[in-house]
């Protein structure tokens, strides 16, 4: 039988991946009932996602919500400062979603 897990975390990970839908599909396939997935993104104000000068990807809130909407229920999301680059804080968002 295939192993199922209760908790997944990807904090400061998705910034290294542009198209993240496949990540969410894999996580969903490994979820036990009501499993939680906690992840962060760097905020992108445009559509979908973009590769930044920092060589990291930023994702829009709408892009993420469209991907998770049929696989997970969003329990919480908060705007945060995810890291500091030099003297500048980088805007991000942390999500807590639950498998449906």
Regions from the PLM with identified roles:
Residues 21-36:
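A short glycine-rich, Lys/Arg-flanked "PGG" loop and its adjoining helix->strand segment in the class I
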Residues 1-3:
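Short conserved loop adjoining the S-adenosyl-L-methionine
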Residues 81-100:
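Core SAM-dependent methyltransferase catalytic element
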Residues 56-77:
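Short alpha-helix
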Residues 39-41:
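Acidic carboxylate diad motif detector
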